[in-house]
Amino acid sequence: TPELTEACILSIRKQGCDWPIVVFDNSADITIPAGTDGNGPKEETIIKARPFKQKMKGVKVIDNTKGQVIDFEQFLSLYPDRNRQLGVWKSSVWGSAKHIVTVQKLWELLPDGFILVESDTLVKRDITELWKEQYSFCGYVQKNQHGNRFKVPRILPMLCYMNVPKLTKEGARYFDPERCWGLKADANLRGNWFDTGACLLEDIINTKPALIARLYPELDKCYIHYHGGSWRGNDLERQMAWLKKNEEYFKKPDNADAKIFICAHTDF
């Protein structure tokens, strides 16, 4: 949502980073089917899109609100037998697959590499220290994802550096339809349980020593995460309460030197 995105950008700027920021805006109306067995809303619910329209210095917005860059309906149509039981409220919206495809597209749009930050994240330190070109990526690995039947490890997408030139050279991928959450019908397939960042991690492991990663076991102490900002888009009151509680990470003190804030806004 735009409020979370703006706060994320402001938190990055507050930590002294004046690097260019790219926001890939996938905002779109979301239809949540009526739940069964007490799961989900009683009636079909439509969450209206709320695009990020704020104009901020040093921030570029890639508008995909109408599928101009990635047509997700067309993408999902390639997998007519995709699993419909691995998602939220017993009906998958394939948010993970869309997320994965988006990051893979960013490899084309930002071929020199980038630091990936999720829009519902607030950073607590200068993230430019993650940019280390001797590594294929710098980030945090989640080994035991809750609810993952096969415990497939992954690189958390909340905050990580990806060295796109190195990764591309060695044939690593962020998206592989054989290893992507819910794109196959059979829930017993291990490949169906690869969440965002899992495919890339496996490729990096399989190409050692060509690709070496820098792991930050305590990287989660460098940021706080709202969790699920993309699919809780209708819960604006909850989001605002979370931002109010954590405003120290992005709000400028009243007596601060204005030069500290060169820009504002961000997220990928």
Kindly label every feature range from the protein language model.
Residues 20-22, 60:
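A structural signal for isolated positions on well-ordered beta-strands in alpha/beta enzyme cores
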Residues 25-27:
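Acidic ATP/Mg2+-coordinating residue in the GHKL
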Residues 111-122:
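Short beta-strand-to-loop acidic/aromatic patch adjacent to the donor-nucleotide binding site
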Residues 1-10:
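N-proximal low-complexity "stem/linker" segments adjacent to membrane-targeting elements
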Residues 92-94, 121-202:
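Conserved catalytic core of nucleotide-sugar-dependent glycosyltransferases
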Residues 168-248:
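Catalytic core and acceptor-binding pocket of nucleotide-sugar-dependent glycosyltransferases
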Residues 29-110:
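Active-site-proximal specificity loops/subdomain of glycosyltransferases
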Residues 10-19:
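Short, acidic, metal-binding catalytic loop of nucleotide-sugar glycosyltransferases
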